[in-house]
Amino acid sequence: MSINSPQYSLPSKKEKQRVRELRKFINHHNYLYYTLDDPEISDSEYDKAFQELLTLENTFPSLKTNNSPTQKVGNNILKKLEEQPHRQRMYSLDNVFSNDEWEGFLKRLANALPEVPFSFWCDPKMDGLALELIYEKGQLTSALTRGDGDIGEVVTEAVRTISNIPKRLKHSINAPELLEIRGEVVISRADFKKLNKEQEKKKKKLFANPRNAASGSVRQLDPTITASRPLRFLAYGIGEIQPSSLKWNTYHELMSYLKEYGFETPPKGKLCISSTEVQSYYTRLQAQRYSLRYEIDGIVMKLDDIQSQEKLGYTSRAPRFAIAWKFPATQVQTRLLQIHIQVGRTGVLTPVAELEPINVGGATISRATLHNEDEIKNKDIRPGDMVIVQRAGDVIPEIVSPILSDRSAKSKPFVFPKICPVCHEKVYRINNEVAWRCINLSCPAIRLQSIIYFVSKSGLNIQGIGQRLIELLVTSGCIKTPADLFTLTTADLLTYKRMGAKLAAKTIQALSLAKQTMSLHRLICALGIRHVGEQTARILASSFIDLDALSSASLEDLQQLSEIGPEVASSIQAFFKNKANIQMINQFREMNIWPIQQVNDTTTKGFFTGKKLLFTGTLERPRAEMKRLAEEAGAIVMTGISHKLDYVIAGKNPGSKLNKAQELHISILDEPTFLQKLLIVL
C-alpha cells in the first residue's frame, strides 16, 4: 500500500508526542501495579490511556513498536526472587467496555472463522495474582508468577503453603508427564477485612485491596509469611502439557478436568451458547458483584472450541479467542473537604482532594487525585462540594464531577496557588504545559524527592536506603544533595533513633559498593534530568565520554542523537547550566565519583550488532544479565518467535519455542557459544 493512499496517513508531531507521553505514563503505572503492587491510579484511568494509545497505533501503524506497552504483558519482575522462563508465554487479555465493543469482537471472530457457531466459556475476571503451577508426573515441582509474560518469579516454597493447592494431583496415576496449571491467587473479601484488622493491631501498614494483599503475600522470600495469609488459588486454564496429544476438545471439558485433578475454579463459571447468553451472564454478575465472595472487575469469555482457539492464535500481547468485558467503575457520593497541593521531584504541583471517608466496593476512600489545575477548572470542582467519586478496584480514585444541586451559594472556585506551598517561591507553567512547576532546585520538597529518586530502583538502586532514612537525613540537614550521601559516615548514622551499628555499617557498605560499581548511564539516569529515563541515559552514555562532555554538548550535538528531540535536548542543557547542579557535579568529581564511557557503550561493531535474539529455556546466568549483555553488544532482544529472528539462545528445557525456531530455520546457539561470540569484534 502506498503511503500516499487515502487509507494510510502519517502522524503529526503532536500525535507522535502524545504517543510518547502515553507510553511513558503507562509504563510507569505498569511498574507500580505489576512490580511494586502499589498502584496510584484507577483502572478506568489506566484503561482510558491504554485505549487511546491503542487507537493511535492502529490509526498510524508506523508508530507501533515492539517495546510499546500495547505489545507487552505486565512489567519487569523484582530482582530479589529467582527468575525462570515460562515454557509457554503467559498472555494478558484485551478488554471491551461496552456492548458495542463486545459486538465488534464477535464480528472479528466471524470474519476469521466464517460459518463456525460460537459458544463461550464465561467466568468472573478475578482480581488477584496470576500464577503458573508446574506438575511433573502429578507432583507439584515449581510455581512461577506471570512476571513479564516470558519470565516469571520462582515462588515455589511460598505457594506450597497455600492450602487449596494440591501438592499431588488427584488421580495422579493417570496424570500427564508434564502439566502446567494457570490461575489466580486471591483473598476473599471477609478474609481481607480480618487480615487488615490484624495488620492494624500489629501497627503495620494496611493493604490497599485484596489484590495487593494476595500479590505481596505470594512474593515473599519467607514462606512462613505466605502461610500466615488466607490465600486461595483458582485455576482457569493450562500452559504446556506433555505428551501434547493429551488435550481437550472444549474449554468446558478442561474446566471439569481441573476440578477432577483437585483444583478450585472461579465461581459462577458457565457455558454460554450465544451472544445473548453472554450478555445476560454479564448483567447478572454485575448485579451480584459485591455479594460474591471474591472481588471481581468483569467477566472473561473464551471460545469454547479449542481447535478454533488454536486457529485464531495470539497477538504479541493477548489471545485473539478471548476477551475481558470490564465492569464500569463504581461511583458513590461524598463531601470534598479540601484540596491540598503536593510538590514532586520535578517540581510539579499536584492537587489532591481530601474526602469525607466513604466505603466504595469494600475499600474506605478518603483521598482522590485531581491531576492539575485544568481538571479542577474543567470539572468546576470546589472545596465543600458533594462530589461523585469513581473507583474501579484500586487505591486512588478519581472525582467524576460535583453535584451542583447541592452546592452552597457561598461556594467559591478553588484558586490554584502561584507560589510553591513548600519554599514559597513563584511557580511557572513552562512551554504551555498543563502542570505548574516550582523551579527552585533548593526547594526542600524537590531536594528531598530528588535524593529519594537518586537511590531508588529507577536511579542507582542502592539497597537498604529507603525513603524514611532519606527524609531523616534531609530534614536534619545532614545532606542537601545526592552527592552528600557519599560523605556519610557510620558515626553520622548512629545519631538517629533505631539506627544500630549493624544497620549503619550495612548502609555505608551499600553506598561504598554503589560508588565502586556505578556506570555512566546509571549515574545519568539517577540525576533525575527531566525527560531522561534509562533508555535515553544509555544513548547519552554511549555518545559522551563523561559528564563533562555531556554538560558541554550543544543543542545541535544532542539533537543529532537518536530519540532525542528539541524538548529533551533543552531539558538536558538546562540541567547542566543550573548552578546548584554544577556544584553537585563538581562534588562528584572531587569525591572521584566519575564514571566514564565503557567499552561496551561504544559503537564498535560486534557479532550481534543489529541482530534480533530470543532467549528460551533455563540459562546458567540470570536472564536479566544475558539480556543486558546482548543489548550492550548491539543486539535487539525479542520476546516472541517470528521469522524476523536471527538467533535463538537455548538453555535447558527450552519448550515449544525451540521447536518453532527449528521449523522456521532460525539459527540456534547454546549459552557458551553465545558468550563466546559476544567477544568477536568485526
UniProtKB/Swiss-Prot annotation:
Residue intervals of the BRCT domain: 603-682
Domain of life: Bacteria
Keyword Transmembrane helix attached: no
GO molecular function (one): metal ion binding
UniProt keyword annotations, A-Z: DNA damage, DNA repair, DNA replication, Ligase, Magnesium, Manganese, Metal-binding, NAD, Zinc
Any GO BP: DNA repair
Active site: 125 (n6-amp-lysine intermediate)
Residues engaged in binding NAD(+): 43-47, 92-93, 123, 146, 184, 302, 326
Cofactor: Mg(2+); Mn(2+)
Residues annotated to bind Zn(2+): 420, 423, 438, 443
Residue ranges the record marks as coiled coil: none
Catalytic activity: NAD(+) + (deoxyribonucleotide)n-3'-hydroxyl + 5'-phospho-(deoxyribonucleotide)m = (deoxyribonucleotide)n+m + AMP + beta-nicotinamide D-nucleotide
Enzyme Commission number(s) from the entry: 6.5.1.2
HAMAP family recorded: DNA_ligase_A
Family to which this protein belongs: Belongs to the NAD-dependent DNA ligase family. LigA subfamily.
Physiological role: DNA ligase that catalyzes the formation of phosphodiester linkages between 5'-phosphoryl and 3'-hydroxyl groups in double-stranded DNA using NAD as a coenzyme and as the energy source for the reaction. It is essential for DNA replication and repair of damaged DNA.
Name the UniProt record assigns to this protein: DNA ligase
Organism from which the protein derives: Lawsonia intracellularis (strain PHE/MN1-00)
Lineage per the UniProt record: Bacteria, Pseudomonadati, Thermodesulfobacteriota, Desulfovibrionia, Desulfovibrionales
GN (gene name): ligA
